[in-house]
Amino acid sequence: MMRITAPIKRWLKRGLPPGMLLSLRKRYAILRYRGTARYCPACDSHLARFIAGGEFLNRPEARCPACGALERHRLIALFFREWSDLYAGGDRSMLHFSPEAVFEQQFRRIPGLDYLTADLSDPRVMVQMDIAAIPYPDQHFDIIYCSHVLEHVPDDRQAIRELRRVLKPSGWAVLQVPVTAERTIEDPTITDPQERLRLFGQEDHVRRYGIDYPERLEAAGFRVLAIPAEGIAGEARIARLGIDEDEKVFFCTPEENAIYRQISGRMG
């Protein structure tokens, strides 16, 4: 099987639009990893296996070779497709912080969706903004998706209040963070990257979230459903989808609205 060398990969990344690059990557991966033992709901690919991922490639079968989705992305992709009304169409607006390439191209194609990407410093997004000071009026967005951002934000409580403020009463948000402790650990005086790595798990993290994370969301006025991966995927599909069984989706609404009742009812 032909292999794509590193120089060719760099040339492709520089010379092709993101959507075309993802398409070529998917076709190549499906040929190289031909099989059905694994399925990626983020890009709808059937594969023989996933590949190692993580900063030190220490998580076997973490990454989809076709689209780059990690365990958390595959869980969110499944939730969006099978549990939410994201793909239902209709005139709605969506705010996506720190957009992942695997989702951005899909969301842009949803009929009727006024899709906005945002980040503090990434020049590729549509609007550069501070998540703790969102420059939009109250009750502006129908959907908000923000994954693995809040652990980088010094005042996450203010950021969560802002997310709640700009969400319509009928809307919903998925606000994901890595949860790796019993209780949230934070100390704003710690600025040394190595000390942050030791205490918070990454040099640019300012806290380590615990299982009390939903309490922060609720303190800002959100109604929160912490939905386990097994509840979303079903025990039989966890391994094939390459999903972390300990992961949860944090589904938030500004009040007990129709979509909250629908999702809550599915949880039983």
Regions found by a protein language model. Name each.
Residues 147-152:
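Short catalytic micro-motifs in class I SAM-dependent methyltransferases
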Residues 25-38, 154-163, 168-268:
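S-adenosyl-L-methionine-dependent methyltransferase catalytic module, highlighting the catalytic core
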Residues 2-135, 235-268:
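Conserved N-terminal segment of class I S-adenosyl-L-methionine
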Residues 97, 144-145:
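Hydrophobic beta-strand segment of the Class I
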Residues 143-144, 163:
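Alpha-helical membrane segments in multi-pass integral membrane proteins
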